[in-house]
């Protein structure tokens, strides 16, 4: 029998018989590992431990101590949910039930359930876990599988598409329950130590709105009850900080079904924050030698064909028919910037050329994936594009990373960094890739940045450095990026005249400091829990007159503080209620103004952190706030140490 080469994570090659399973290889490495094997990761894909190896592969054995074990456990938990559902609702029809980053979901139809029904389903699931049912894999003839699902068009659709070329398909059974599934799964339902159902939402089959509407039930699972409790507590904290909740409380933004899903409407308070964010990044760009440009929201599709986006992204684009000519809302800003560069003749002395734009883009995400500001159809990217000589790459990337680090420091955000290298399919020669990767890695080393190398995870057009924000709850969000691009200059035939009087191809660098304004707005809202630093806060100071007689004096103070965002609470409330409301509204500074303050020409200041008041001179307060805003401090500091 022929053999295949299995390469282990440490690089060790093993010659095994073709058709050997993941579990067979584990036993060949050692009997203890074989006994502990739960699944395998074959060429990056999580598979069942009984999966046959028919070609040379890279293999990682998954045990209970592996990160991937949680995915396997949650996949089995999805089946436990489905079994519990069918025990309680015999008409329930199952579609798909994958694991996710935080748990699992299962899309169902045939029954009408809501959040109130989850408790009973969860209780039945706990019974199934208590029964400790063996989970067994069975290979079934594909035609037989069609017969088993003669009343389930969704499973038949899977058999006709994903399994179209398979003679046999796998089913997993536990007790009376069975499901068409590729796996992998744990050995028994009793391995699930903590199980919870979380929420219900609507979904569409295959994620397409024209298909059947389904009910999606989300859940999670852990090896222990303690781990589940910790997750649920973290989830509770996250719900308290949910930017959608805070956005409504603070009148920051809204999303209205009348205007369309994934199309946020920024209210005055939200727009004030956006303006500050935009001014901040514009200042950084100008200081770094960028020129601001502007491109339209829509282009003829000829541009998108030239850039390659039409070929690769057309399904995610919003297309328009204008006088029998096709246009597309822009999904990215880079083709417009490349076109601007294309308008001029450039010498090697002119480079680098740096453009920036707060450019609105549009991407047709699946409706079920839209969520607040984290996933939208319309969003704004603080896009920067640099056109550089190959010998300028390292210097420009270093300067860009410096700006990114300054930005993260300004907002007091921790971060992680990934360095993504050349994928199997790529454009550009070996020499330029090797040099570019070396230059990017050199920048990270020079900045003493801890990073993870993601082998083969770069874009097809160049390597990249990705930063991920870490918020106050330890969650990670996509953030700044620096990407080299050898492809677009080629597609647009961009060039500059070199010192040798010959035409040369520049390298394009894509760069964003926030990623997108929408996601960054979301991250900041949840990171600060709505308590924005004074320089960002939509309302920086609220004046609280003790009585209506003090309103005129408050108006005079408002005029003196006209460089700041100041409001007057003129409702006929008690001072205590006014203070409490200002705290609830997360206003950084509150100034109580009564007869004593008016007679003395002072104000009584308190901040949202300190619960005591200090009588001070208006000019002193103004001077401090000017410093606090100019230095973009992340906390209220006026009363600290006074």
UniProtKB/Swiss-Prot annotation:
Reactions it catalyzes: tRNA(Thr) + L-threonine + ATP = L-threonyl-tRNA(Thr) + AMP + diphosphate + H(+)
GO molecular function, one term: metal ion binding
Enzyme Commission code: 6.1.1.3
Binding site for Zn(2+): 334, 385, 510
UniProt-listed InterPro entries: aa-tRNA-synt_IIb, aa-tRNA-synth_II, aa-tRNA-synth_II/BPL/LPL, Anticodon-bd, Anticodon-bd_dom_sf, Beta-grasp_dom_sf, TGS, TGS-like
Cofactor(s) listed in the protein's UniProt record: Zn(2+)
Keywords: Aminoacyl-tRNA synthetase, ATP-binding, Cytoplasm, Ligase, Metal-binding, Nucleotide-binding, Protein biosynthesis, RNA-binding, tRNA-binding, Zinc
Domain TGS as annotated: residue spans: 1-63
Family: Belongs to the class-II aminoacyl-tRNA synthetase family.
Name of the featured protein: Threonine--tRNA ligase
Native species: Haloarcula marismortui (strain ATCC 43049 / DSM 3752 / JCM 8966 / VKM B-1809) (Halobacterium marismortui)
GN (gene name): thrS
